[in-house]
Amino acid sequence: MAGPQGTELSYIGKGSFSIRVKGASAGLVPIGNVSAANVRVTEDKKELLDYQSAGGGQANALRRIQTVELGMTLRDFTADNIARALFGSASVVAAATGVTESVTGYHDALTPLGKAGVTNLVVKDVTDTTTYVAGTDYDLLRSGLWVYSSGSIGDGDTLHLTYDHPAQNVVEALVNAGLEYEVFLDGLNEAQSGKAVAIRFHRLRFGPVQDWGLIADDYGEIALTGDLLKDTTITTAGLSQYMKVTYV
């Protein structure tokens, strides 16, 4: 029961976000660790000044919501999160053994390989008759081949490779237009003994990531901002076409 000073209902939010493409026949999948999430509202304000008195002031004012945005700071670099940030597509390549690949090797330079995390690499010439020696003719880097000018491989030679590779995620960037999503927060209020908070964003369209640090000294983040749009599939009177907040 509220006292003379009102009810104490402070808020410190925590929780897990889930997402799915708007209209998809699929469940909402976890986004992962989100270190910050903020709803930002901008307004269009019309002011009518009082021109009838010397003291000034306002005769009337009109405030209309102009835009609503959801800003999120993602900390899990899943392939799906990266794809959303770069308007891309995500896929998984299964682990494989005995994979073959043909590349051109250049002296004292890096040749990228088609897969990452390669092991059990065998490098041969274009006729498959000469097997080159690791550490003398070439070195295997994390995702590429380094050819030594002091070795037996000629500059610009075609090389036949055989190797194994682990399962890996692949993101092809900038191949999709920005998709629309439904986002749900399964949250809690830490300031109120962890009581449940549920927020549903019915229709969001995210923009691309503005700044993605590829090399840094601290944990990385993906900062996304989405526009909250009107969901015309919700037609029941009294129900929001934008978002719904439920809390205990």
Question: Residue ranges of each PLM-predicted region?
Answer:
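Solvent-exposed edge beta-strands and adjacent loop segments
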Residues: A2-R84, D137-Y138, K195-V197, F201-I222
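A sequence-level detector of short linear motifs
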Residues: P30, T131-A134, Y148
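Extracellular Ig-like/FN3 beta-sandwich strand-entry sites
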Residues: T67, G154-T158, G178-E180
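Beta-strand secondary-structure signal
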Residues: E69-T73, H160, E182-F184, A223-D227
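Extended beta-strand solenoid/passenger and fiber regions
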Residues: T78-R142, D164-I199
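Mixed-charge, glycine-accented linear interaction segment located at domain edges/termini
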Residues: V126, R142, Y148-I153, V197-V248
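Small/polar beta-strand repeat architecture
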Residues: S149-Q168
